[in-house]
Amino acid sequence: MADLLYLPKKASSLKIPAWLMDKLASLGLTMPLSCEALHIMDGSSYTYSSYKAQQQLGWSAGYPKEEFIEYVSHLATQLSSAKKGCSMKTKHLSCQWGHVTLSLESAQLLSVKGNSDNAVFFGQGYGTAKLRLWQLDLSRRVASGRLSEIMGNGALRTDVFQRRLGLVELAERATNIDCAAPTHSWQAMQYQHIQAYTAGINQALSEMKVLPIECLLLHYRPEIFSISDSYLLGQLKYFINSAWQYELFHTRIANRLTPKQHQQLLATFSHEGHQIPPLPLNENGDWHQEVVKALKDGLKGLQYLGLASPDTGSNVIAISGSLTQSGKPLLATDPHMGHVNPNFNLLCRLESDEGLNVVGSHFPGSPGIIVGRNNHAAWGMVGIMADNQDLFWGKLDLENEQVETASGNLPLTKNIHEIKLKNGKSHSFTTYSFAQGRLVSEKNGYGMFLRWPALDDPSGDITFYQLAKCQDWPSFRDALKHVKNSPMMVGYADIHGDIGLQTMGYIPKRHQQIGSLVLSLTEPQHQWLGYVPFDELPCEHNPERGYTLYANQYSESLFTGKVALSNRWHPPSRSRRIEALIQHTDQHTTETLTAIQDDKTDYFAQQAKHFLLPFVPEDKMLSQWDGNTENIQASRLLDVWFQHLTDKLLGKVLKRGSRTLYTDFWPSCRWSILNILQHHIEDWQHEADALPDLIRECYATALVASQKMAHPQVEFQHSIKKPIWLNKLLTGRFPYQGGNRETVHATRQNADFLTQSQAGKNKSIKTKPYTFGPGFKLISNLANRGECVYLINTPAKGSPFFWQLRKTLNDWQAGKRKTTRLANKQNNNE
């Protein structure tokens, strides 16, 4: 006889979508139209374990009926609450640090108020766990290499790689450093804040009767959080910028090119209009001998290891009072990242009686605010593409646990790991490391080691507490000196009228600017020479032009004459477009900065048309187009045209795989291709007089292909990928509305054209979704001590079902921002 489950009363009048009822019915579930009861049709078994159901649900073992009922009840409750949107009742808490009150000021913003800073961080931890427990635990499992315990064998390779990095050991070292620090030091204060934050997480976990739906689906309960878990997620931030992946690509592709081809294909185009060579050149325009040797050695290392076969955009803008309507500065920031559900960030407002008064983005796992504002100042962060990681290869002697280096054979530290799998089995393997790197790959007696700054010193500021309390330019810069993880360019503005940019993070010093290549451990010239001192990092303070901006570009005014930070930068498309929009008026307001943040005009397209269109007089679309990518048909045509030009132009020199990697890894690929077409086509084995035919042919094929393409979607993907029907329930989406990887509102697909342009003559081309773009947008008006205008693309509450994302995604598409105002309080250290 079927078991009967009575659902909450609030679900009784809910109309369940027919498609969902059909899906439940196909799994042996029936649901009355009134939704007053739900039947589990499982015959006589006490376990929901029919083979067919297991396959459809993606479970490898029988699921206890009581917990399956709990899951379906949770699903029905989620369906019901979708009608009311995301809400959270005001919560009053007491802890050893004082009293704290939590509420959702809006569906996008968590508000935490307490009578001490530690009480506030306790509340922030509590609220984060209530809203994002799955995200917290998933991040912890990724960092520690424990995904396979809940996701099965499909996550094993990820776990093995993470165990090779050894982030848990680094986190424990960082924890011990802060724990042992002098009582009144910033490290000791950070430890206390993390202690309070972790206690809040565990308080919420202990009270939680209904776990996040992901935990019910995967049949597990998260463990309590330790203080070192927070430091662990801090270590994970080192890999926001995975420079080492570019080093693999750069070493492979550079060995297939002549110096001329290499400079043409991988040059940096500065904001000021010059080309910066990707590797050091001598006076004749050839590579230095050190570069030649490094290229050959790097390729040799990849061949030994069997790896010889063959990104992001953000903006920060600060405008001084001389160019604003109020006479006070404005600051806008919009970090770009992968579109995920839930968002990597949680917007929070933190207020305490001890002077903490800040609003902005919180990275779940560590207390505090990373990007935001207080009553005195505002700040935003942008990745600088810094080369703060290196790949080294060397000869191994694992029997004697040694590696060959420039200093002779050095001992390796050996650790044996056991990864528990979801099916009850385990996987054992061995990791090796030494002071200069973690062994991430080994083959034929050679190893690849990854080095990053935390191996030298895993400590550092991960809570940004001093930044949250900064009051002026000097205290702002002081607050950044202890930040060591992923290097950033930080934009700044304050109520005193100051604006500026400051680089932060640990960046290695090197003999030569060749950190973007895989290097040999036996070469003394490849060893790190310490780190660039903070006061030598690029910065800009109160420029005469009245504004400062950074959009991942190479600006000669910032970087020329400084220690080399990278060989890879974004093109100046966004920075030049932003600059042009800033120069439209000297009366900027929150509204004008909103328009800049949401701008989808392709600056590069506007420039490229002047060269390309004379070759195709038959064109009727692009000649009338102003570059606004919201005209999807015209924008798509230009994109596909450049994709076909890239494929055709490079086809005689680079294989298909390398061409795919190039368009994916190199942000300035369109600028480089245009430059080659204009000046260097013969260097790529094409006759000069073949240029007109090549451009026309690619236009014709692009026109046909672009007209066949289905309208793409923008997707916010969940980490649970299988079964497919479940992933669809957990993925938010909306129709693509313009933007590309070079517009201010940047969005992108990865290596899209080579996988989408091969459809048959009469078939439509299915386009990949756009899965990268702005994570949130903040604008701070310094004329008002507390005003912050904000917008984020997923709600604070981390419910994964797509129907609960609709309201927030609709606001995101429409650019519908909300405003919050901090209390008019003074910091306790004024």
Where are these regions (language model features)?
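Terminal hydrophobic/aromatic helix or amphipathic segment near a protein terminus
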Residues: 2-43, 81
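Amphipathic terminal alpha-helices
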Residues: 48-55, 60-87
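Substrate-recognition/specificity elements adjacent to catalytic centers across diverse enzyme folds
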Residues: 89-330, 335, 341
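Proteins synthesized as precursors that undergo proteolytic processing into mature forms
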Residues: 157, 174, 198-199, 454-478, ...
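Glycine- and hydrophobic-rich flexible loops that cap the catalytic core of alpha/beta enzyme folds
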Residues: 352-368, 372-377, 381-522
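Hydrophobic alpha-helical segments
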Residues: 485-585, 643-646
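Terminal end segments
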Residues: 564-617, 695-830
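Charged, long alpha-helical assembly modules
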Residues: 643-724
